[in-house]
Curated annotation (Swiss-Prot):
GO terms for cellular component: bacterial-type flagellum basal body; plasma membrane. FliG is one of three proteins (FliG, FliN, FliM) that forms the rotor-mounted switch complex (C ring), located at the base of the basal body. This complex interacts with the CheY and CheZ chemotaxis proteins, in addition to contacting components of the motor that determine the direction of flagellar rotation. This is Flagellar motor switch protein FliG. SUPFAM superfamilies: FliG. It is a peripheral membrane protein. The keyword Membrane applies. The record marks R160 as: Part of the EHPQR-motif. GO terms for biological process: bacterial-type flagellum-dependent cell motility; chemotaxis. Belongs to the FliG family.
Amino acid sequence: MSNLSGTDKSVILLMTIGEDRAAEVFKHLSTREVQALSTAMANVRQISNKQLTDVLSEFEQEAEQFAALNINANEYLRSVLVKALGEERASSLLEDILETRDTTSGIETLNFMEPQSAADLIRDEHPQIIATILVHLKRSQAADILALFDERLRHDVMLRIATFGGVQPAALAELTEVLNGLLDGQNLKRSKMGGVRTAAEIINLMKTQQEEAVITAVREFDGELAQKIIDEMFLFENLVDVDDRSIQRLLQEVDSESLLIALKGAEPPLREKFLRNMSQRAADILRDDLANRGPVRLSQVENEQKAILLIVRRLAETGEMVIGSGEDTYV
């Protein structure tokens, strides 16, 4: 079997367990893994009896060894923790460890569903549960799902995402029970997610009309919260992803001293982004100024960065800068 790779062995195993079981296995793999296995499977021509027997035999041996090691490891870990921490604290800690181990995939399945199917699956749940689910998804998937809700539900869920502080342990069991019915036993991660940054990242990926409506709805509830979301929606550091033509247009509007101070607090890739869009002479002068200018107060840096972002927004609103990604632009 030396000529068979791990992927080849996996393909052989998947082809022996039937379509339904293979589909269940695929649900627990990453997109890249599914792609690799699918490509290998499509290229299969013939599997000899010896190859099949060898693969199944190896799988059986490894499965038995893994199961035995897993049981012994858990028992060993419990014994060590009890001796170190006492029965009560050890039990609590072990429960957390095993729960984390068993729920690392979270509700990742929803990331690979069609947005319409995912939206249909969760739209009738309580808005807080929907918000809790969405903060665990890729931002683009969450935005696509939100776009399929009616406006009232979309605004309610986004407000809950913006004020989300994580799942409290007391509520975790109840929430998991609800989600088990929806997601075939998938559980939520405990890590703290959500909040203003998450809300901003999701809104950034929504269509302009929906974005404006959501911000308006949040502002009616809490003006300060809405402003925090707006402040997070496009950061100075995000300029590193803006196209060169837009950066060149921005440079026509920004004062050189303001840019110097703003870039004092920027990462090297962003500095280089600006420098390579300048004339050679202007870039050389700015490099010298950045190297020779002494320390600048953080408050000064932040003020200049905010001032530049105001220019960015103005140029984006007039269509002179493109600062979004994908089909939609942020205005």
